[in-house]
Amino acid sequence: YILLILIQRFIRGLNMKKFTTTLAALLIMGSASSFADGHKVKVGMITTLSGGGSGLGIDVRDGFMLAVKGNKNISVITKDDQRKPDIAVQLADKMIQSDKVDVLTGIIWSNLAMAVVPATVNQGKFYLSPNAGPSKLAGKGCHKNYFNVAWQNDNLHEAAGGYANSAGFKNSFILAPNYPAGKDALTGYKRYFKGSLAGEIYTKLGQKDYAAEIAQIRASGADSVFFFLPGGMGIG
């Protein structure tokens, strides 16, 4: 629905005030299958399709393509960011400047989102985030053209911190990868957890061997462990 709303807004040139007043009507309509001027909306999907974390990107791509299947008013350009911020920036620049996309989407990793989203929205393009939700893009850092259709990174982990309290845990060992989403995760947990920390570790992004960290956890005396290890990093 959010994509359809943005498409309607783009086509009709709605200002923000008019957009907000017609939002409910657009949701009820639930369809943007016909456009008066025949404009075909271009969507640029930059996501991780190879290497570590590609499973998440593939799922996002497949789900998105299923949602727009059969819609002749939407064209989608899909590219692999290889989980590299510099590649993501290059792809976004090309899609905006050369391909003339109207909407960008697809990024999984928050460090890539921080590299791409600000420049995208500041050029008047819409960005729909299907996964990455850096806290720096919320609140005072939010932009009217940025829509996070997943979550803000720290929200889920705040709930985990609250649960740890209700479960009676007093001494947590916490760890996450050293990148924006990892930092948001542990910040969110600590925001609501009222106990003490037996340890706090930021691992390398993409790391899969945690023998050293497990040894530290065993020696720490922690009564609980909270970790955020997305994608392939959490399998092993």
Walk through the language-model features, giving the residues of each.
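Short, Lys/Arg-enriched N-terminal segments with co-localized hydrophobic residues
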Residues: Y1-N15
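Sec-dependent signal peptide recognition
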Residues: L3, K17-A25
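Sec/Tat signal peptide C-region and signal peptidase I cleavage site
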Residues: N15, A32-A36
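Immediate post-signal peptide segment of exported/extracytoplasmic ligand-binding proteins
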Residues: F35-M45, K72-I74, N165-K170
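Beta-alpha junction/loop-to-helix N-cap segments that form part of ligand/metal-binding clefts
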Residues: G38-K40, G55-D62, G70-L137, V149, ...
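Periplasmic-binding protein-like
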Residues: M45, M95, D99-I108, L128-P130, ...
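Glycine- and acidic-residue-enriched helix-capping/strand-helix junction motifs
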Residues: S50-D62, P180-T187
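Extracellular/periplasmic Venus flytrap/periplasmic-binding protein
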Residues: Q90, S135-K136, K144-G236
